[in-house]
Amino acid sequence: GIPVFEDTPAATPAAGYAGSVIGRFTSDMVVGGHKISGFSVFNGSYSVPVTPQSPVPLASAGNAFNFVRVGTNNRIVVKCSSAVVALAGSQNPQSFSWDAVNDQLIPVSLSPDAITFNATLIQVDTNGAVVSYDDVTGFATWNTAANVAVIQI
């Protein structure tokens, strides 16, 4: 999963859409006071194509992926640093940060641009599958030798 933000649109009849605005959370959003609202998930996404070159579901503009909100007690799988793997067996819940450059979960960071949130660390694995995206070809493949964590948000 990747962190997402959620904003309530302005109360105008000309907005042209109903519902909240959801988008990918980035580290520069911390300055504006945004918080992580949830994480994107693959399961339950419909009509997202996979191809032999790109076996990971990819959605273009206008398509949708599901997301789960923080506080719903859902368990999600996220890419994590080896420092998070080292936390296996420690007490829960814990504070974590999101490394937006490497798109991975890291132990809590005191950096002013850190995206920090609380979660329960359920399980870690050093041989999990995460998405590897190639900016040049536009293909996404599974990296099956990555560190992953199952967290309850």
What would you call each of these model-derived segments?
Residues 1-153:
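Surface-exposed, low-hydrophobicity beta-strand/loop segments enriched in small/polar/acidic residues
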